[in-house]
Amino acid sequence: MQETGVRNGAYGADKFGLKNLKGVKWNLTAPHLYEDALRAGEGVLSGDGSLCVDTGIFTGRSPKDKYTVRDANTENTMWWGGNQSITAEQFENLYQDFLKHAEGMSLFAQDLYGGADPSFQIKTRVFTEMAWHSLFIRTLLRRPETAELASFVPELTIIDLASFRADPARHGCKSENVVAIDFTRKIVLIGGTQYAGEMKKSVFTTLNYYLPDKGVLPMHCSANVGPDGDTAIFFGLSGTGKTTLSADPNRTLIGDDEHGWGKDGVFNFEGGCYAKCIKLSAEAEPEIFAASNRFGAILENCVLDPITRKPDFNDGSKTENTRSAYPLESIPNASPTGRAGQPKNVVMLAADAFGVMPPIAKLSPAQAMYHFLSGYTAKVAGTERGVTEPTPVFSTCFGSPFLPRDPSVYGNMLRELIAKHGVDCWLVNTGWTGGMYGTGHRMPIKVTRALLTAALDGSLRNVEFKTDPYFGFAVPTALPGVPSEILDPVKTWADKAAFDTTARKLVAMFQKNFTQFEAQVDAEVRAAQPEAKLAAE
């Protein structure tokens, strides 16, 4: 077997059971992986030097094909209401079949860290069949110093074989595509898909399982910090604006998607960003645009001009879920440490497909826990298979697909941290205004940015608020530089009766969804939900 690259010679591929390989390329850097990917026909270069790839039939995650081993360790610790199980025997069959499938292959291996805080990071080794997958995970996780690689011993091992096809009868899955996690053995198997996001979300799911026991709240959020050291957290599902809104030229970016919150503050799980780039423009998102159009970036499923090889970010013909992966250092004001102090503000982003929520509202601590557990947003087109237009959904903790433990574990931790550190909480609608999806339009990003700036610099605390008659949270009545009518959603609708009907419908949806959590929260949180009389009238 031919091996190249820097590695721990005493802890190689054989420790994972891989044998009869043609070779392993260890910890290659971006130039090497570009060359390997291009030689293998995995992608092409854009006119600006990005590596452009297609992910095939899977242009998003496939949560229905994700499984966790149910054993003595996970039986009573997993949230089985939100996760699918397979037996240890089925996983072992899958594992052995992965090893067999890999025989004769030349694999790529990366040794990386999940987590910027050394006290809580997980050492992760990722084997991939495709060169661009190796570049992707190297870009998205945190890279050790070269000197650390010689003694690197992984705690978590991932093997991603895109050409593998699972056997539902033998492996306990539903299709040929599979993502299987064994928390006891700390192994993740990914097969049948070229969508690289499955790798990063498997690391996230693993950290979500282990960190609560260490006193750290894992979060599906972005984070940044102001010049005065004021940290802000942005919760939200894919496509709601986490990446866009945290990339603020006046604030230091901690990270765009996954963080932990513990006794010393906030830390990024990752070393890169994975931004949606449909309709990306230099005018609206200059930092992300520049980071996406340079050497080292990976563009997924973007359409290129056949002559200039420039990407057309407005073309969603392959998928609405076009993506750009780039290292954090491509953002000029990104934090090199990936760490910051205790948050001063928590922002919950909701892409309200009904168009009845205000662009910003202030939440009490009880309301914050209520909306965190509710996780209202819209599944935005193309983020997951089978979703072609925004659909209103409730995704608890703004990340239901990634929660291995009961949502109340994360909800209670959030409430305790908010109370302990006196954090201000805000709900921000990045979805629709002037009507529901199909008749209204997306909230202007300039309005959202202006409101967020006012919230984060403290000036929004000094304006007049009124109580929203449907949802009960506090809504500002005016803010300099923002049209006052957009602050009150009913004023943006031509048909006021239709607004009232739609708002009551959404209130009822909130109430129905929250019944699953009522037994796990106290009276104060139960009282924070939209008032029942509005839906009943």
From Swiss-Prot:
<keyword id="KW-0963">Cytoplasm</keyword>
<protein>
    <recommendedName>
        <fullName>Phosphoenolpyruvate carboxykinase (ATP)</fullName>
        <ecNumber>4.1.1.49</ecNumber>
    </recommendedName>
</protein>
<dbReference type="GO" id="GO:0046872">
    <property type="term" value="F:metal ion binding"/>
</dbReference>
<feature type="binding site">
    <location>
        <position position="220"/>
    </location>
    <ligand>
        <name>Mn(2+)</name>
    </ligand>
</feature>
<keyword id="KW-0456">Lyase</keyword>
<dbReference type="InterPro" id="IPR015994">
    <property type="entry name" value="PEPCK_ATP_CS"/>
</dbReference>
<feature type="binding site">
    <location>
        <position position="285"/>
    </location>
    <ligand>
        <name>ATP</name>
    </ligand>
</feature>
<feature type="region of interest" description="Disordered">
    <location>
        <begin position="312"/>
        <end position="339"/>
    </location>
</feature>
<keyword id="KW-0547">Nucleotide-binding</keyword>
<dbReference type="Pfam" id="PF01293">
    <property type="entry name" value="PEPCK_ATP"/>
</dbReference>
<feature type="binding site">
    <location>
        <position position="201"/>
    </location>
    <ligand>
        <name>ATP</name>
    </ligand>
</feature>
<keyword id="KW-0312">Gluconeogenesis</keyword>
<feature type="binding site">
    <location>
        <position position="323"/>
    </location>
    <ligand>
        <name>substrate</name>
    </ligand>
</feature>
<feature type="compositionally biased region" description="Basic and acidic residues">
    <location>
        <begin position="312"/>
        <end position="321"/>
    </location>
</feature>
<keyword id="KW-0464">Manganese</keyword>
<dbReference type="InterPro" id="IPR013035">
    <property type="entry name" value="PEP_carboxykinase_C"/>
</dbReference>
<dbReference type="GO" id="GO:0006094">
    <property type="term" value="P:gluconeogenesis"/>
</dbReference>
<feature type="binding site">
    <location>
        <position position="201"/>
    </location>
    <ligand>
        <name>substrate</name>
    </ligand>
</feature>
<feature type="binding site">
    <location>
        <position position="323"/>
    </location>
    <ligand>
        <name>ATP</name>
    </ligand>
</feature>
<feature type="binding site">
    <location>
        <position position="448"/>
    </location>
    <ligand>
        <name>ATP</name>
    </ligand>
</feature>
<keyword id="KW-0210">Decarboxylase</keyword>
<comment type="similarity">
    <text>Belongs to the phosphoenolpyruvate carboxykinase (ATP) family.</text>
</comment>
<comment type="pathway">
    <text>Carbohydrate biosynthesis; gluconeogenesis.</text>
</comment>
<dbReference type="InterPro" id="IPR001272">
    <property type="entry name" value="PEP_carboxykinase_ATP"/>
</dbReference>
<feature type="binding site">
    <location>
        <position position="257"/>
    </location>
    <ligand>
        <name>Mn(2+)</name>
    </ligand>
</feature>
<dbReference type="InterPro" id="IPR008210">
    <property type="entry name" value="PEP_carboxykinase_N"/>
</dbReference>
<keyword id="KW-0479">Metal-binding</keyword>
<feature type="binding site">
    <location>
        <position position="195"/>
    </location>
    <ligand>
        <name>substrate</name>
    </ligand>
</feature>
<dbReference type="GO" id="GO:0004612">
    <property type="term" value="F:phosphoenolpyruvate carboxykinase (ATP) activity"/>
</dbReference>
<feature type="binding site">
    <location>
        <begin position="236"/>
        <end position="244"/>
    </location>
    <ligand>
        <name>ATP</name>
    </ligand>
</feature>
<comment type="function">
    <text>Involved in the gluconeogenesis. Catalyzes the conversion of oxaloacetate (OAA) to phosphoenolpyruvate (PEP) through direct phosphoryl transfer between the nucleoside triphosphate and OAA.</text>
</comment>
<feature type="binding site">
    <location>
        <position position="61"/>
    </location>
    <ligand>
        <name>substrate</name>
    </ligand>
</feature>
<feature type="binding site">
    <location>
        <position position="220"/>
    </location>
    <ligand>
        <name>ATP</name>
    </ligand>
</feature>
<feature type="binding site">
    <location>
        <position position="201"/>
    </location>
    <ligand>
        <name>Mn(2+)</name>
    </ligand>
</feature>
<dbReference type="GO" id="GO:0005524">
    <property type="term" value="F:ATP binding"/>
</dbReference>
<dbReference type="GO" id="GO:0005829">
    <property type="term" value="C:cytosol"/>
</dbReference>
<keyword id="KW-0067">ATP-binding</keyword>
